[in-house]
Amino acid sequence: VKALEEDGKICGYANLRVIAGEGEVERIAVHPDFRGRGFGRKLMEQMVSSGRMQGVTDMTLEVRAGNETAIKLYASCGFQKEAVRRGYYREPVEDAVIMWNRGI
C-alpha cells in the first residue's frame, strides 16, 4: 500500500497486488479535498514503478464504467480498455471496465 500525505494529512492511497508476474491495481483513492491536484497520477506512477521493481510487465485494473475521470487518468498512464463485466457493481448497478497496460 502506498499513501500520499500533504501537511500531515493522508490525501490518497493505492494498493498493488502481484500474482504470477502480473500486477493488479486493487485500490486507488484520493480524498475529495485533494482531487484535481495530480495525486491520482502520482499514485498510478508509484504503482507502475512498484510493479516494475517486482518484475511485473503487465498490469490491470477495473473501474466503474461511469468514472470517466479515472478512465482518462488510466488511459493517460498507458492502460487500454480490454473488457467489460456487465452489471458487476451494485448500489448502483454498473458495468466494470477492465483495463490493461501491457509491457510496462
Model-derived segments and spans:
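Acetyl-CoA-dependent GNAT
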Residues: 1-33, 41-46, 50-54, 102-104
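Active-site acidic-Proline motif in GNAT/NAT acetyltransferases
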Residues: 31-37, 65-67
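A secondary-structure capping/hinge motif
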Residues: 81-83
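Alpha-helical macromolecular-interaction surfaces
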Residues: 38, 42, 46, 68-72
